[in-house]
């Protein structure tokens, strides 16, 4: 079963809120500056899974040495898969299925930063609302509390 999350920029607080699409769940916000992040709970992000990295709102598998679980980014407005434009993560996931070495932790961090923030900075509010689908991923994001009413299905 896929985990569906709403990613919403709150301009009043300058934070990026990641929330479950379906219900009111517990969670967190990620700072828009990528600098002042509140520390995650120890059970949510183990130290050996990249907890020291700046994007702690991502699932713990995102920075594991084995690479992330299947992950795709979609724009809520266009419902397009944007990850394929970069042609980076699909190759990494394919290599992973073949047992080959995956992308380095530094490369993964840069990749996610580019996907999450570059378009928002350059294009403004056009694609600020995105849905993250973790297909069959057992790893959980630490999300901001409150339901997300912008998108009811993906």
Swiss-Prot record:
Key words, A-Z: Activation of host NF-kappa-B by virus, Activator, Apoptosis, Host cytoplasm, Host G2/M cell cycle arrest by virus, Host mitochondrion, Host nucleus, Host-virus interaction, Modulation of host cell cycle by virus, Transcription, Transcription regulation
Cross-referenced Pfam families: X (PF00739)
Region (Mitochondrial targeting sequence): 68-117
Locations listed in the record: Host cytoplasm; Host nucleus; Host mitochondrion
UniProt modification remark: A fraction may be phosphorylated in insect cells and HepG2 cells, a human hepatoblastoma cell line. Phosphorylated in vitro by host protein kinase C or mitogen-activated protein kinase. N-acetylated in insect cells.
GO terms of biological process kind: DNA-templated transcription; symbiont-mediated activation of host NF-kappaB cascade; symbiont-mediated arrest of host cell cycle during G2/M transition; viral genome replication
UniProt keyword Protein transport, yes or no: no
Cellular component terms per the entry's GO annotation: host cell mitochondrion; host cell nucleus
Family: Belongs to the orthohepadnavirus protein X family.
Described purpose of this protein according to its UniProt entry: Multifunctional protein that plays a role in silencing host antiviral defenses and promoting viral transcription. Does not seem to be essential for HBV infection. May be directly involved in development of cirrhosis and liver cancer (hepatocellular carcinoma). Most of cytosolic activities involve modulation of cytosolic calcium. The effect on apoptosis is controversial depending on the cell types in which the studies have been conducted. May induce apoptosis by localizing in mitochondria and causing loss of mitochondrial membrane potential.
Quaternary assembly: May form homodimer. May interact with host CEBPA, CFLAR, CREB1, DDB1, E4F1, HBXIP, HSPD1/HSP60, NFKBIA, POLR2E and SMAD4. Interacts with host SMC5-SMC6 complex and induces its degradation. Interacts with host TRPC4AP; leading to prevent ubiquitination of TRPC4AP. Interacts with host PLSCR1; this interaction promotes ubiquitination and degradation of HBx and impairs HBx-mediated cell proliferation.
Name of the protein in its database record: Protein X
Organism: Hepatitis B virus genotype E (isolate Cote d'Ivoire/ABI-129/2003) (HBV-E)
Organismal lineage: Viruses, Riboviria, Pararnavirae, Artverviricota, Revtraviricetes
